[in-house]
């Protein structure tokens, strides 16, 4: 880790000494990095260079997902990491050296209200916001809750109420999503 060390006399205020010769800090030495992504060095998971700290906005990171989009039918896919924070959604690109590049302005100010709902699918990412069920694709963010109204005819629960605490799973084989809220299931 990056840091500075001194082998000399240090101030003893805020420290307590035990019977041995070690001085232990009494607390307050933790640092919270709620809006940072910390990356290890390429091919070395035990090395964390200073350029590997990427700040993502001002809010707390609540989830991440990968979004891959094909450039063309025969071209390679471009990978983007979608970062969900308490202040919006950020899209991070991978630079040529394998690290996340600088963070651009937010992709969207839409806030994910249920981190358990963040689900990657082929060419997209689902998540739940206060507006409803959202889908991120290479074309942007779309609210698809309106398209799903009436699909839950066998229940008297409003769709927006149902998805607030629901988990989402993607069935790759059948290309379908499962929206499950255990607290709303009938016995």
Labelled PLM ranges:
Residues 1-92, 182-187:
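N-terminal beta-propeller domains
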Residues 64-187:
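Beta-sheet-dominated scaffold domains
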């Amino acid at each position: 880790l990056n840091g500075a060390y001194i082998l000399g006399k240090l101030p003893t205020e805020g420290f307590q000494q035990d019977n041995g010769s070690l001085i232990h800090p009494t607390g307050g030495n933790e640092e919270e990095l709620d809006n940072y992504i910390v990356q290890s060095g390429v091919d070395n998971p035990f090395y964390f260079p200073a350029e590997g700290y990427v700040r993502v906005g001002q809010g707390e990171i609540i989830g991440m997902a990968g979004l891959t989009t094909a450039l063309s039918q025969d071209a390679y896919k471009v990978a983007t990491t979608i970062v969900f924070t308490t202040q919006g959604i950020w899209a991070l690109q991978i630079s040529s050296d394998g690290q996340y590049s600088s963070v651009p302005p937010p992709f969207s100010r839409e806030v994910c209200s249920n981190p358990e709902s963040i689900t990657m699918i082929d060419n997209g990412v689902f998540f739940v916001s206060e507006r409803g069920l959202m889908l991120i694709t290479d074309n942007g963010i779309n609210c698809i809750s309106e398209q799903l109204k009436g699909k839950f005819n066998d229940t008297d629960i409003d769709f927006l109420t149902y998805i607030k605490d629901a988990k989402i799973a993607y069935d790759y084989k059948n290309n379908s999503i499962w929206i499950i809220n255990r607290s709303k299931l009938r016995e």
